[in-house]
UniProtKB/Swiss-Prot annotation:
It comes from Methylococcus capsulatus (strain ATCC 33009 / NCIMB 11132 / Bath). ValRS has two distinct active sites: one for aminoacylation and one for editing. The misactivated threonine is translocated from the active site to the editing site. The C-terminal coiled-coil domain is crucial for aminoacylation activity. Its main location: cytoplasm. PANTHER family: VALINE--TRNA LIGASE, CHLOROPLASTIC_MITOCHONDRIAL 2, VALYL-TRNA SYNTHETASES. The keyword Protein transport does not apply. Keywords: Aminoacyl-tRNA synthetase, ATP-binding, Coiled coil, Cytoplasm, Ligase, Nucleotide-binding, Protein biosynthesis. Residues 849-920 form a coiled coil. InterPro entries: aa-tRNA-synth_I_CS, aa-tRNA-synth_Ia, Anticodon_Ia_Val, M/V/L/I-tRNA-synth_anticd-bd, Rossmann-like_a/b/a_fold, tRNA-bd_arm, tRNAsynth_Ia_anticodon-bd, Val-tRNA_synth_C_sf. Its EC number is 6.1.1.9. Belongs to the class-I aminoacyl-tRNA synthetase family. ValS type 1 subfamily. This is Valine--tRNA ligase. The gene is valS. Transmembrane segments: none annotated. A motif ('KMSKS' region) lies at residues 524-528.
């Protein structure tokens, strides 16, 4: 093995070997275990959320593969309709063209070309993460098999009356000119205004005051609503007001939706441009007056004054407010904070828009999906997310599935010259079914399906449905879905509905919901904040200048660049070092506590990189002491020392902890157990203890220790493999032959199982005693500032009979690891000398101080340290007592200062105690 651990030297080589050898494919006769990857956008690149989620899935897949399950991790990508189309449209815009200049067929061909040349970025990056997906089965949501499934589902749902075309209110992006899903709308609080407007009563007896954040929409008002129990207005219900600027009379209606306490208690109702107003409009059969075209400009309607025709909505707002003010109909204008919905792709304000769209009737599909979770056929982890699921499902609305773009699954519906609609799997089927010969022209619907429609079929369409292929029977239902909370409704619920409808069973047994990956301060990562980390940069490293350039390019708000550059230079003065994939994966696992958002700190990755180094160096030590030597496989007698029996026993405990944690999706606890065993027990203790046996034991003991060194290392590599696949494979291929294991890959080895026969409570008790004595001596050495290499005389007193047995048996271990000059028991009744003392139960461990330290020099040194801390403490206490600091500083900074104060206080107390001990000598 190389002297230094270099992850890049091994990662790419091993991944290519695994993939070329077909090791990711399902094998064996074990129980099926299947995970469907949430298909990433084919045009996208890996972000921290992907990297975290894919690590969790790969840990599960590798774990179950080694458990002997017939394991499939289904690979695939999503066509990502709007996102992909926008990329290609931007390319066309760069040469002064639009998609309409090319025409539909040529544009779609252009998108396919771009997908083939540029669409493999994210799958290459998944490989860099070590993701053991079965690439031989990779699917794409627009490939022919999945497209056939989409058409089949659409036709069946339409024939059952569960898909229909109708005019309803949708989220409309006026730049893209298409409906968008709620998930593609980002609502953030912004500063705006609240306009209070007077609507005159039609009988001239006065006016009502309504408040709105969107005065331009008053051109489409069709009512004023009041609460039916509001004494101020109850007598006006059924009367009319005259809508300013238009002259239309609109009714005053009573509806319990109105909050009498908000504003004047009167609400303008614009059913065609507000979702709440739409519901009121439906309840009261109000007219739906659309005032905007697809680009959010005022329509040239006869009931809207011509001066507003063609104006952009914000130009119309200014003119409407001006005209109302001129008429004395503005009561007041207030500053107001409001939630503004913007398209996540374009950044423009999304408009509630009344338009003809295709819808799925969701109610009949939701009932069985709710029941499946209630009956426990699907379990959410953590359980509390089932409440979110129920909340959405009980309030489900019909699903708008049509999009006014070109890239996607075209809706399988055709129209004749009279506007009659025919739905079928193909135009040929439609003509045959309805007796329409070639002389009757048919026009296919221009719209495509919402990307989530094909994604909802992912668990069974990827396995060959509607054909009944063997893999469909084997792997459906899948085992677990790993996903974020933000798409429980958009994807999870819809997969459940479609799976139950078309497969007659749930699509997965469990849903593991993970949190968001945030930065070290708990802030959401976003390009505008300049705090985005690229997982590939953490693997490969990136220079400061390249990182600054990366973070400041392509900003929607270029003025943020200077601030982002300043922060980046402050946070990463040396850029980001290369950590390697295994360190990043182990970091993600150690942070994967169920249901919580993840605070991602590079210090954690650095710690995990150090963990990889520790494992690498431990393996080098083991190989240097075992390769070419007798490790017990030749039949020679083996005698197992106390450290051998102890580490074997501790390994059984570690296996039990990791296995239990994996069953509970507590990857953080599994990673913690691995870390503690490898670092604290195997490396820090056992390897040091083994040196003593190898140097002084008899041949049978040395043989037993060599066997244990190699055997435990081989087993812990298998235990750690799902988390750290590359380094474990590299080391395992060298170590495995020493244990008699010969195989092409660790991936196909069995996962360790705890062996009760190797549990040795007696060895653990004795080793705990040995470790306490050693630590006690080391603690005194540190407190008294005694050189680590200086051998110390140790006396023991007041111990039990068991202490005497253990000290006699483990004397060589104590002398070597505690660096003792001598180890003796005081005779019964013999007075204890002036000494520093460590207590181990009843046992007193004494280090006589006479002649070991310069008492006066040590007291002088301690006084200086105490004085330094005495000056530092009041300054820090004052800072934490400053209300201004506490209110303005980020919570993470405050907590850091509190922790520093606690450390200083503990350090001062320790120094004072040490001074008192030395003064007493």
């Amino acid at each position: 093995m190389d002297k230094v651990y270099e992850p890049h030297a091994i990662e790419q080589r091993w991944y290519q070997h695994w993939e070329a050898s077909g090791f990711f494919a399902p094998v064996g006769e074990g129980a099926p275990y299947c995970i469907m990857i949430p298909p990433p956008n084919v045009t996208g690149s890996l972000h921290m959320g992907h990297a975290f989620q894919d690590t969790v899935m790969d840990v599960l897949i590798r774990y179950h593969r080694m458990k002997g399950d017939r394991t499939l991790w289904q690979a695939g990508t999503d066509h990502a309709g709007i996102a992909t189309q926008m990329v290609v449209e931007r390319q066309l815009a760069g040469v002064g063209q639009t998609r309409h200049d090319l025409g539909r067929e040529a544009f779609i061909e252009r998108v396919w070309q771009w997908k083939e040349t540029s669409g493999g970025t994210i799958t290459r990056q998944l490989r860099r993460m070590g993701a053991s997906l079965d690439w031989s089965r990779e699917r794409f949501t627009l490939d022919e098999g999945l497209s056939r499934a989409v058409r089949e589902v659409f036709v069946r749902l339409y024939e059952e009356g569960l898909i229909y075309r109708g005019k309803r209110l949708v989220n409309w992006d006026p730049v893209l000119h298409t409906a968008v899903s709620d998930l593609e709308v980002i609502s953030e609080e912004e500063q705006g205004h609240l306009w209070h407007m007077r609507y005159p009563l039609a009988d001239g007896s006065g006016h009502l005051v309504v408040a709105t954040t969107r005065p331009e929409t008053m051109l489409g008002d069709t009512a004023v609503a009041v609460h039916p129990e509001d004494e101020r207005y109850r007598h006006l219900i059924g009367h009319s007001v005259r809508l300013p600027l238009t002259g239309r009379e609109i009714p005053v209606i009573g509806d319990t939706y109105v909050d009498p306490e908000f504003g004047s208690g009167c609400v303008k109702i614009t059913p065609a441009h507000d979702f709440n107003d739409y519901a009121i409009g439906v309840r009261h059969a109000l007219p739906m007056i659309s005032i905007f075209d697809q680009g959010a400009a005022i329509l040239p309607r006869a009931d809207i004054p011509a001066k507003y025709h063609g104006l952009d909505r914000y130009e119309a707002r200014d003119l409407v407010v001006h005209d109302l003010n001129e008429l004395g109909l503005i009561e007041k204008i207030e500053e107001h904070r409001l939630m503004v919905p913007r398209g996540d792709r374009t950044g423009v304000v999304v408009e509630p828009f009344l338009t003809d769209q295709w819808f799925v009737k969701a109610g009949p599909l939701a009932g069985p999906a709710i029941k499946a979770v209630e009956e426990g056929r699907i379990r959410f982890v953590p359980e509390n997310w089932s409440n979110t699921y129920y909340q959405w499902m009980y309030n489900i609305q019909d699903w708008c599935i049509s999009r006014q773009i070109w890239w996607g699954h075209r809706i399988p519906a055709w129209y004749d010259g009279e506007g009659r609609v025919y739905v079928g799997r193909s135009e040929e089927e439609v003509r045959a079914k309805h007796g329409l010969d070639a002389s009757i022209p048919l026009r296919q619907d221009e719209d495509v399906l919402d990307t989530w429609f094909s994604s909802a079929l992912w668990p069974f369409s990827t396995l060959g449905w509607p054909e009944r292929k063997p893999e469909l029977d084997t792997f459906y239902p899948t085992s677990v879905l790993v996903t974020g909370f933000d798409i429980i409704f958009f994807w999870v619920a819809r997969m459940i509905m479609m799976g139950l409808k078309f497969m007659g069973d749930v699509p997965f047994r469990e849903v593991y919901i993970h949190g968001l990956v945030r930065d070290a301060e708990g802030q959401k990562m976003s390009k505008s904040k300049g705090n985005v980390l690229d997982p590939i940069d953490l693997i490969d490293g990136i220079s400061l200048e390249d990182l600054v350039a990366k973070r400041t390019q392509g900003l929607m708000q270029p003025q943020m660049a200077a601030r982002i550059e300043k922060r980046t230079r402050q946070d990463f003065p040396e850029g980001i070092p290369s950590y390697g994939t295994d360190a990043l994966r182990f970091t993600f696992a150690s942070l994967a506590s169920t249901g919580r958002d993840i605070r991602f700190d590079l210090k954690r990755v650095e710690g995990c990189r150090n963990f990889c180094n520790k494992l690498w160096n431990a393996a080098r030590y083991v190989l240097m002491n075992t390769e070419g030597q007798d490790c017990g496989s030749g039949g020679g007698a083996c005698s197992y020392s106390l450290p051998d029996r102890w580490i074997r026993s501790r390994f059984q405990a570690a296996v039990g902890t990791v296995t239990e944690a994996m069953g509970q999706y507590r990857f953080d606890l599994a990673a913690q157990a691995l870390y503690e065993f490898v670092w604290n027990e195997y490396c820090d203790w056992y390897l040091e203890l083994a040196k003593v046996v190898l140097q002084s034991g008899n041949e049978a003991e040395r043989r037993g220790t060599r066997q244990t060194l190699a055997g435990v290392l081989e087993s812990l590599l298998r235990l750690a493999h799902p988390f750290m696949p590359f380094i474990t494979e590299e080391i395992w291929t060298r170590v495995a032959p020493l244990t008699g294991a010969f195989a092409p890959t660790i991936m196909r080895q069995s996962y360790p199982e705890a062996d009760p026969a190797l549990a040795d409570p007696e060895a653990e008790r004795e080793m705990a005693w040995v470790m306490e004595v050693i630590l006690g001596v080391r603690r005194i050495r540190a407190e008294m500032n005694l050189a680590p290499a200086r051998p110390l005389p140790v006396l023991l007193s007041h111990g039990t009979g068991q202490d005497r047995v253990w000290s006699a048996r483990s004397g060589p271990l104590l002398e070597k690891l505690a660096r003792l000059e001598s180890l003796n028991w005081l005779a019964p009744g013999q007075a204890e000398p002036e000494a520093a003392i460590a207590l181990v139960g009843e046992l007193r461990v004494l280090i006589p101080m006479r002649g070991l330290i310069d008492k006066e020099a040590e007291l002088t040194r301690l006084d200086k340290e105490i004085q330094r801390l005495d000056k530092e403490l009041p300054r820090l206490e004052g800072k934490l007592g400053d209300a201004s600091f506490l209110s303005k500083a980020p919570p993470a900074v405050v907590e850091k200062e509190k922790a520093r104060l606690a450390d200083l206080q503990a350090g001062l107390a320790s120094l004072v105690a040490q001074k008192e001990r030395i003064q007493a000598l």
